[in-house]
């Protein structure tokens, strides 16, 4: 099946992400309580295409079910880090002149960008409007994207921990100032990072939610 389109600006029709209260689902489907884990069986060996495209599906993520349970409620605080610890959001996710597929976080030039969760680097290279970009595939089923970097500090296949430096802020690609363009994706499809992260408090939202295969 073809993957999602490779652009920074996605049409609004692609953005809805159903957020389901797991406790609400539990009485109707009690088997869900024992069939999920915050750690997923993810694909860790990458093809040349995996290393060169942003929107890539993980063949293991939906290999048994067409709905995936994403559980962030059991992740310890030490296994999460705000990607730009000293930064502030200057442009939110959603509709502006075009649809914005992530959030822009501003700080000084060459500030340290860190991995949000433990994971493995899938892509690290210059890519179109993203400039120098890094994609990290996480064991919780998510991927995070870090772009416009002045310098990438990791390469595909590197295993990274939450809080580990992976890049320096810059303005490579289509950018008017030094900042981090940060995205969250599932199976190649971007969604609002505020579902996962509290940008004002610089921490993550300990939700459990369902995501249907696209």
Predicted feature locations:
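Catalytic cores of peptidoglycan-degrading enzymes
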Residues: 76-213
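Polar/charged, compositionally biased leader and regulatory segments
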Residues: 1-92, 204-214
